């Protein structure tokens, strides 16, 4: 399918409901659907190349502000995510040390000591539900975040063809929610983004540098949500 259509968008076969009725009377019927996870903000992006990605932090903050998540709560979420991954304490010093010297005395005062990533201090997050232990992250907060935020095993770009208006507005500094909603309406009317350049051009923001926009047109990560029924029992 990818060879015939390079885009990942709604209306393709993956977006159709999945129904498996079974081949015999003993088989339990199942139904489900695939969700393109790259239409959401990926919390894994807060750390990339053992560095805290400050632009992605600002993107998440803009999204939370739109959703009405308190600044203290979103700051705790950011801190919790960052603590789950190796990261450089002083990436600028590490870059300079890598260029200026290859000597490592093994002491913390060595210029190269700044090039050793800090080990994670918290367990890796696998789902949004793992945020429940954070002060202020209530079931209501998780319910608010769920349509717009995900946690994937790798860094990803946002798919402009499956993203919602709030996520697009958060990803592009200066893009209003109203303008993002207009772009989504145009997209869902059949005018899909064909590449990153097309997306940037349709923003009509000439001051925006295309290289700074991490919005693509495809998805590599999907989540399967399904359920099986047997009599009065249902397994999700």
Positions of predicted regions on the chain:
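Compositionally biased linear targeting/interaction segments
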Residues: 1-236
């Amino acid at each position: 399918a990818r060879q015939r259509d390079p885009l990942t968008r709604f209306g393709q076969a993956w977006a159709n409901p999945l129904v498996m009725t079974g081949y015999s009377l003993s088989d339990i019927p199942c139904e489900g659907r695939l969700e393109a996870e790259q239409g959401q903000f990926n919390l894994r992006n807060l750390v990339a190349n053992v560095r805290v990605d400050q632009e992605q932090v600002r993107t998440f903050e803009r999204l939370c502000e739109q959703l009405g998540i308190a600044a203290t709560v979103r700051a705790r979420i950011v801190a919790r995510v960052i603590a789950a991954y190796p990261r450089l304490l002083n990436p600028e010093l590490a870059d300079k040390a890598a260029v200026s010297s290859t000597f490592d005395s093994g002491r913390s005062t060595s210029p190269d000591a700044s090039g050793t990533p800090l080990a994670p201090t918290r367990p890796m997050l696998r789902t949004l539900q793992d945020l429940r232990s954070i002060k202020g992250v209530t079931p209501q907060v998780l319910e608010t975040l769920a349509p717009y935020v995900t946690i994937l095993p790798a860094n990803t770009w946002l798919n402009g063809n499956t993203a919602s208006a709030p996520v697009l507005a958060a990803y592009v500094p200066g893009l209003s929610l109203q303008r993002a909603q207009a772009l989504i309406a145009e997209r869902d009317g059949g005018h899909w983004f064909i590449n990153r350049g097309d997306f940037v051009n349709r923003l009509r923001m000439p001051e925006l540098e295309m290289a700074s926009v991490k919005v693509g047109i495809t998805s590599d990560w999907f989540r399967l949500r399904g359920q099986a029924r047997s009599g009065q029992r249902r397994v999700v």
